[in-house]
Amino acid sequence: PRRVEPVREEKSVGTETTFFDTVTDREHARVVLLDQTHQCAARLRASDLRCRVVVLKARGADFTTVTRSRTLSVPTDLAHDIWETVSSLYSALPTPAGGFRLLGVRVEGLLRPDDGVQLLLGEDPRRGASERAADAVRRRWGSSALAPASLLGGGTGAARAPRGEVRQRGREDEEGR
């Protein structure tokens, strides 16, 4: 028999949203993916990890599931970098017949700073400072204290889905969403 290990190293970080009603509006789906990207990046930074692989998961109304992944040239913990990849993968993905039933973002190939992560020559050490500052604001004032404007729904029609419309899977924040 194998020994039970109560704590084990994370192999991936991700979150998924299952919709009660299928989503056919690609802009609404894009906003959901952006929110998930920020959640994943914040969890990476909180765990002092960087990722090498970004994965997009989509399930259609007929329950057909498609995953697309891309390996990054440089490991990252920044939502901006992860979003560029998620957005590119999503743009190449057609809307399934009947719409999306589930969308998810996952990052894999996790590395710790002591794993010898190589930085780019000439990389600005301040890069990512704004995301780390936003993390500090959210820790102090709650997860809804600060968000990208596109997640606020200020008249663009791309509002964050009300809590009753979705079921989230993934590690939740201390507020218990």
Mark where each language-model region is.
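DNA-contacting surface of Y-family translesion DNA polymerases
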Residues: 1-100
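Acidic, metal-coordinating catalytic segment for phosphate/diphosphate chemistry
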Residues: 74-177
